[in-house]
Amino acid sequence: MAAGFNWFLVLSSVFLCNLVKTFLPSISSFLSKIFHKDADQEMEMRTEIQNMKMELSTISMMDEFARYARLERKINKMTDQLKTLVKSRTAQQAKMKWIVNIAFYILQAALMISLILKYYADPVTVVPSKWIAPLERLVAFPSGVAGGVGITCWLVVCNKVVALILQAVS
């Protein structure tokens, strides 16, 4: 692996995963807006409530108490329906966000496991043994090559470096 550009494949995979992870909230919000179109009904209900409140402000409570009370009950009922609708939409958005996150992390884990299995025996790169002397066996795992950097260590380092770079950029 050290001779070719496979290290670049691993690095670009890690970069892409971290980039997608950065935009995950936006992606899940976009998907929830596509799948749940309740916003139009909510807007209708809000405008209807506003109209009824305007009408309520024109009615004298002393002169037309029965009409005033009916309209007030109607407003309260519609407000409760709106709250229920908003609560339902919020729950659906949370569920969509949870599903998108779980799907992403499953795909990311599958990608990382496939990279580890593919490059299990080969070092990603070979450096002088003195550079990594105290941790040489740990860094070389699972390849076991002296002075080699194994795929697991490479993935951990790449994930951390890419995450720090993306955090600094955003």
UniProtKB/Swiss-Prot annotation:
Residues in the Lumenal compartment per record: 1-6, 118-137
Disulfide bond annotation, renumbered to this chain: none
Entry keyword annotation includes Electron transport: no
Membrane-spanning intervals of the chain: 7-27, 97-117, 138-158
Coiled coil location: 61-91
Gene label: get1
Protein's name according to its UniProt entry: Guided entry of tail-anchored proteins factor 1
Keyword Ribonucleoprotein: no
Main function: Required for the post-translational delivery of tail-anchored (TA) proteins to the endoplasmic reticulum (ER). Together with CAMLG/GET2, acts as a membrane receptor for soluble GET3/TRC40, which recognizes and selectively binds the transmembrane domain of TA proteins in the cytosol. Required to ensure correct topology and ER insertion of CAMLG.
Any GO BP annotation: sensory perception of sound
GO MF assignments: protein-membrane adaptor activity
Keyword annotations of the record: Coiled coil, Endoplasmic reticulum, Membrane, Transmembrane, Transmembrane helix
The organism's place on the tree of life at top rank: Eukaryota
Description of how the protein assembles with itself and partners: Component of the Golgi to ER traffic (GET) complex, which is composed of GET1/WRB, CAMLG/GET2 and GET3/TRC40. Within the complex, GET1 and CAMLG form a heterotetramer which is stabilized by phosphatidylinositol binding and which binds to the GET3 homodimer.
Protein family (similarity comment): Belongs to the WRB/GET1 family.
Residue ranges of the region described as Interaction with GET3/TRC40: 35-93
Membrane topology per record: Multi-pass membrane protein
Cytoplasmic side: 28-96, 159-170
Localization per record: Endoplasmic reticulum membrane
InterPro entries recorded: Get1 (IPR028945), Helix_hairpin_bin_sf (IPR029012)
